[in-house]
């Protein structure tokens, strides 16, 4: 684990009296920023357009036909052990992280009964890679001889600037094809992994994919183990975080979209549908579409170079979540979560009654099961009817006993608001810092100075956004943690030169004060 005091160490414990920050967006990024600021004495107002907090990880209350209430979410979320900053955020409301329960393994299911597992692997590279390659039934000695060793070595040679410089203009599919793995091995070992980032291989940057390999597998000292929340997110995470913030003087405004932001001589004016607020600091912790809409309605935030960066942000293809309340049990021994590949558009199957209290209670009372199906990167031409048929066929193939079960209740969600990491998108991608003092971005679309992804990227960006604003008043930052920023076989540099390069990259990506190969 590495520790980063960004953008600078600071000397004061608390901010000067009278400072006010507005955080637009009550997802993980916004709440992380709000916590760091409120803890240091800044008066914080969080403005969220939905009636619930959490953003894309949020949960809201619905009712079954029986009248029973339940919390619905946008799908399964894994809390990997190297999500250091997200876990620090959660420890503010649960120091022992008792809200989480481990899933020690998750199988990868393929056609014809093929199965891969990541349990029992060594934690560190290259031994985890060697062990996985050795035990997989999808590769023999002849296959290993054909593998492109130089291309495969790039997974162990991760170095931020070099990786994106060399691989951002290549697609993930082009890189994976260059490995020359046999089709079954590629499908079972790589396809599920790459699909989990919502971006299809034919569009995703190979540089981003290599960063993900480094972050989740070859550079991750914690192993491919993750935890899940035992209760719905609203009860276990977001309602407690709201109370935590309110106890520290924060105000949370729900069902209140931000319409525009206006620059003032000494701060900002934030306009909502019902009021205007003045603030010293503003963090825009919004989805890509919401951010772009807000900036289009904020003519004073018109720096052309920066707006070109924010306008370059895109969305990946839609994803679908289908939760089914079924009238009978599944076969004993089924995994709580399984990745799937090679059978239609189905990407994973979650059995909520095996890990979430609310679903477990329902299953115990009724004798049924709560099953959730996910599909990522759904082609735009696929209709909902076609997708439903495809996902159900996949469920029946992998878990044949479900053919005999009836669906008592269902919820179907299809959304398109996840950020794209397309080929060539790294250079223009905005970081947390903006051209305007006191205005920052936060979200999992931001470029960061350390390897990070998904929920961890969101939480880290929010903390960094708060740190940048606190640095103006020499307030001590929230320490940020990450796995090592370089792979074990990254190109060698002289130690002093490497240290200087890393300080330069981290400082200037965070502050935007000087040009850098990975400038924000």
Name these PLM-found stretches.
Residues 358-365, 415-449:
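FAD-binding beta-loop-beta segment adjacent to the flavin cofactor pocket
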Residues 38-65:
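Glycine-rich FAD pyrophosphate-binding loop
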Residues 2, 17, 256-371, 376-382, ...:
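Mid-domain catalytic core of redox enzymes
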Residues 18-46:
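N-terminal Rossmann-like FAD-binding beta1-loop-alpha1 element of flavoenzymes
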């Amino acid at each position: 684990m590495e520790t980063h005091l960004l953008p600078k160490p600071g000397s004061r414990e608390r901010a000067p009296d009278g400072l006010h920050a507005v955080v637009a967006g009550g997802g993980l990024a916004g709440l992380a920023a709000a916590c760091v600021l409120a803890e240091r004495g800044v008066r914080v107002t969080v403005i969220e357009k939905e009636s619930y907090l959490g953003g894309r990880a949020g949960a809201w209350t619905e009712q079954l036909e029986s009248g029973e209430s339940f919390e619905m979410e946008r799908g399964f979320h894994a809390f990997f052990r190297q999500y250091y900053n997200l876990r620090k955020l959660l420890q503010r409301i649960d120091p022992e992280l008792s809200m989480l329960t481990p899933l020690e393994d998750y199988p990868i299911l393929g056609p014809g009964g093929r199965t891969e597992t990541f349990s029992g692997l060594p934690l560190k590279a290259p031994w985890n890679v060697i062990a996985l390659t050795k035990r997989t039934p999808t590769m023999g000695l002849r296959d290993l001889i054909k593998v492109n060793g130089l291309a495969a070595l790039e997974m162990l040679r991760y170095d931020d600037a070099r990786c994106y410089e060399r691989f951002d203009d290549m697609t993930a599919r082009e890189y994976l094809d260059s490995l020359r793995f046999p089709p079954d091995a590629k499908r079972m070992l790589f396809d599920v992994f790459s699909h989990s980032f919502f971006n299809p291989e034919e569009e995703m940057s190979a540089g981003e994919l290599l960063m993900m390999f480094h972050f989740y597998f070859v550079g991750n000292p914690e192993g491919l183990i993750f935890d899940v929340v035992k209760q719905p997110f609203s009860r276990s995470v977001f309602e407690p975080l709201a109370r935590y913030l309110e106890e520290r003087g924060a105000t949370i405004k729900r069902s209140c979209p931000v319409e525009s932001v206006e620059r003032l001589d000494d701060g900002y004016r934030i306009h909502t549908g019902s009021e205007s607020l003045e603030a010293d600091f503003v963090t825009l912790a919004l989805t890509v579409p919401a951010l772009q809409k807000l900036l289009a309605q904020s003519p004073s935030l018109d720096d052309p170079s920066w707006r070109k960066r924010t306008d370059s942000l895109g969305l990946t293809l839609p994803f679908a979540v289908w939760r089914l309340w079924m009238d009978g049990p599944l076969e004993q021994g089924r995994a709580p979560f399984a990745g799937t590949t090679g059978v239609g558009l189905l990407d994973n199957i979650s059995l909520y009654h095996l890990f979430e209290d609310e679903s477990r209670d329902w299953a115990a009372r009724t004798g049924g099961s709560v099953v959730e199906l996910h599909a990522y990167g759904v082609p735009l031409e696929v209709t909902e009817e076609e997708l439903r048929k495809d996902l159900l066929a996949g469920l029946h193939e992998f878990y044949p006993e479900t053919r005999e079960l009836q669906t008592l209740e269902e919820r179907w969600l299809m959304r398109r608001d996840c950020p794209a990491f397309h080929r060539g998108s790294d250079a223009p991608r905005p970081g947390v810092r903006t051209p305007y003092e006191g205005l920052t971005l936060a979200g999992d679309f931001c470029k960061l100075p350390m390897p990070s992804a998904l929920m961890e990227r969101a939480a880290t960006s929010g903390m960094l956004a708060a740190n940048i604003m606190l640095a103006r008043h020499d307030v001590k930052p929230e320490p940020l943690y990450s796995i090592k920023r370089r792979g074990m076989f990254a190109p060698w540099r002289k130690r002093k030169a490497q240290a200087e390069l890393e300080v330069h990259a981290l400082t200037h990506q965070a502050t935007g004060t000087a040009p850098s190969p990975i400038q924000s």
